[in-house]
């Protein structure tokens, strides 16, 4: 009989329907109910991208697509995917409990975010481990980051180069690549959190493989907590770069994300485009990985390497 291994795929989660918005937002705010104004603001942003975020369907397609890719590529073990979300059901704890009930003794966990941070990935891993400890299993081997995977870097480079083909050859010199990820509170730097450096490394690796001659690092989608967050924000960065260099084309590459969701469809496609329109430059963004076969191959390689080692 083929050995069964759990595949715990963890992600942020998103409201499934309009009625979920309040409890979802309350969970993000550690149980503090948001004001009517905050809910209206979030509703407005979802409305601007054409309704609720497609993230739930994409996460599902990524998890089960990864399960299939792993099982199709070898017959040593059978992987079974379980989705665990941070802010809405099925919660991380629900997924661990389902694995335990199914008699899974060993699992590999991966967070659908390439960079490690104590604030994000570590928090997911901690919840999974605590849930497993409480139940007496399964044993979870956590993948902390996977931004260095050569197939991941190549995937983004290919997408950027494809996008650059839309730019007239004589304007390529006036083009800049903006590489970004979700901002986090600046206090993470006090604890030598590797997150900012990992984004820098990702940008450097990608830049070596693209035809675009300039790049800059930015942060986006910061929370409204009143404390300082990592910067520069991508919108401020766009204005600053245009003011200094008069770039004609901006290619936004939110490599910290793996799907087309609110932070990309609104914070990039709407908010950043407002700025490029304002300064008279062109806005470009390569397609997100979503559940594309080349991205599933990235994840498959990462999980299989973890399992094999």
UniProtKB/Swiss-Prot annotation:
Primary localisation category: cytoplasm
Where it sits in the cell: the answer is: Cytoplasm
InterPro entries per record: Ferrochelatase (IPR001015), Ferrochelatase_AS (IPR019772), Ferrochelatase_C (IPR033644), Ferrochelatase_N (IPR033659)
The pathway entry for this protein reads as:
Porphyrin-containing compound metabolism; protoheme biosynthesis
The residues the record assigns to binding Fe-coproporphyrin III are 12, 14, 29, 45-46, 53, 124
Can you tell which superkingdom this protein's organism belongs to? Bacteria
Entry's EC annotation? 4.99.1.9
Molecular function GO labels: ferrochelatase activity; metal ion binding
Question: Which keywords annotate this record?
Answer: Cytoplasm, Heme biosynthesis, Iron, Lyase, Metal-binding, Porphyrin biosynthesis
Instruction: Identify the residues that bind Fe(2+).
Output: 182, 263
- Which reaction does this chain catalyze? Fe-coproporphyrin III + 2 H(+) = coproporphyrin III + Fe(2+)
The biological process GO terms on file are: heme biosynthetic process
Q: Which NCBIfam families match?
A: hemH (TIGR00109), PRK12435.1 (NF009095)
Q: What does this protein do?
A: Involved in coproporphyrin-dependent heme b biosynthesis. Catalyzes the insertion of ferrous iron into coproporphyrin III to form Fe-coproporphyrin III.
Q: How does it assemble?
A: Monomer.
UniProt lists the family membership as follows: Belongs to the ferrochelatase family.
Question: What protein name applies here?
Answer: Coproporphyrin III ferrochelatase
Protein species of origin: Listeria monocytogenes serovar 1/2a (strain ATCC BAA-679 / EGD-e)
């Amino acid at each position: 009989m083929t050995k069964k291994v759990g595949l715990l795929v963890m992600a942020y989660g998103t409201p499934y329907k309009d009625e979920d918005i309040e409890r979802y937002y309350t969970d993000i705010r550690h149980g503090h109910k948001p004001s009517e104004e905050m809910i209206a603001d979030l509703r407005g942003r979802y409305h601007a991208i054409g309704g609720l975020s497609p993230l739930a369907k994409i996460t599902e397609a990524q998890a089960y697509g990864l399960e299939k890719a792993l099982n199709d590529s070898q017959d040593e073990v059978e992987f079974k995917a379980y989705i665990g979300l941070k802010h809405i059901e099925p919660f991380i704890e629900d997924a661990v409990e389902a694995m335990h009930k199914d008699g899974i003794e060993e699992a590999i966990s991966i967070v659908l975010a390439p960079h490690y941070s104590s604030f994000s990935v570590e928090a997911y891993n901690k919840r999974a481990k605590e849930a497993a400890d409480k139940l007496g299993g399964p044993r979870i081997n956590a993948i902390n980051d996977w931004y260095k995977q050569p197939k991941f870097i190549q995937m983004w480079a290919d997408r950027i180069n494809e996008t650059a083909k839309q730019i007239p050859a004589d304007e390529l010199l006036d083009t800049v690549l903006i590489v970004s990820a979700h901002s986090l509170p600046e206090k993470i730097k006090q604890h030598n959190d590797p997150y900012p450096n990992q984004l820098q490394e990702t940008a450097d690796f990608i830049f070596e493989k693209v035809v675009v001659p300039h790049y800059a690092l930015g942060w986006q989608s910061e929370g409204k907590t009143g404390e300082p967050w990592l910067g520069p924000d991508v919108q401020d960065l766009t204005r600053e770069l245009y003011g200094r260099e008069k770039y004609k084309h901006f290619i936004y590459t939110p490599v910290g994300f793996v799907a087309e969701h609110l932070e990309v469809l609104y914070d990039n496609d709407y908010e950043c485009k407002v700025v490029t329109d304002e300064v008279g430059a062109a806005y470009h963004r390569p397609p997100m990985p979503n559940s594309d076969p080349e991205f599933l191959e990235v994840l498959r390689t990462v999980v299989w390497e973890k399992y094999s080692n």
